[in-house]
Amino acid sequence: MDLNEESAPSGVLFEEDVAEQEAKMANGGPKKGKKLEEPYRLEIVWFNVLWFVLLHAGALYGVYLIFASAKIYTTLYGFLLCELSLLSITAGVHRLWAHRAYKAKWPLRLTLMVLNLLAYQNSIYEWARDHRVHHKFSETNADPVNAKRGFFFSHVGWLLCRKHPEVRAKGGRIDLSDLERDPIVMFQKRHYYKLVPFVSFVIPTLIPMYFWGETLSNSWYVSTMFRYCLSLNLTWLVNSAAHMWGNKPYDKNINPVENLAVAIGSLGEGWHNFHHVFPWDYKTSELGNYSLNFTNAFIDLAVLLGLAYDLKTVPVSMIKTRVGRTGDGSHDVWGWGDKDLPKELADQTMIENRKTE
């Protein structure tokens, strides 16, 4: 793709954006962007390169220590922190703050904010801003994780270089007023780099040492370095693999796909073709199966506890209409007789040993 071309809007963020997007598609889709005044040049941030090389090296050593000397409690603790980190991304900054797919009372918002510090994937404010840009300008130069620039770039490379000028330009136009009205979000934004070292690195390292006598080395490399690196890569797969490998039952014209492996690893974020078509649905999928969408179960539990409310979801009629209009024909059917079974497949099906009247 041309990295010197200005990006045009390509997606929606919230339920109220649908009418605007439908009108644009009716008029022939978004207009082709104009050329940027200055040619884009990739600028590598070598500090970030060094940091991620050391992080992954430390994580690999942590894997060795899991089998060589770390206590089982340390390993289990590391995986628990990894899952909590992922939950802060999926249920918190993604579905709650970036897409406003549901609302949460302050105890849940505070909990998700603290866990977001553990995840250390940028502040809620910055993460939500970049993600809104990603949806609004998906697979264009304004997309921070543009998958058309390859797997490596969309997975981790985007963190190793300066943002494309279009990302900065379009990011400055995204409405963030709802985040700015949230005191919990703004508190974290103001104090983010003072809190992250303690919540994401110091405390996770000290707890195994204090409570079950783990060594400093095992605690640091397993429950901190390995845990952090694993949670990062499971999150990044949503940007890379879930934009490349899978089927497109809801819209065959966009890059995001349905990817079961990513869904399992990321607590339900792999149903990405659905999510990019209906980003305001709190389930991020058509499925209600908790085993393949743990975040959905967490939000539903929060509802039962009175901590979450106003959950937005897409009606079946809307899904069926979109599947029929833009899907690739891979939408699942339950078997013979399902009204979603394509007629041409039904006509070609052979029925053996047919009962005679």
Swiss-Prot record:
The primary gene name is: D12Des
Record's cofactor remark: Expected to bind 2 Fe(2+) ions per subunit.
Q: What is its EC number?
A: 1.14.19.6
Organism this protein belongs to = Acheta domesticus
Report membrane topology: Multi-pass membrane protein
**Notes on the domains:** The histidine box domains may contain the active site and/or be involved in metal ion binding.
Where is it predominantly found?
A: membrane
What's an example GO BP annotation here? Answer: unsaturated fatty acid biosynthetic process
Q: What is this protein called?
A: Acyl-CoA Delta12-desaturase
For this UniProt record, the keywords arranged alphabetically read as follows:
Fatty acid biosynthesis, Fatty acid metabolism, Iron, Lipid biosynthesis, Lipid metabolism, Membrane, Metal-binding, Oxidoreductase, Transmembrane, Transmembrane helix
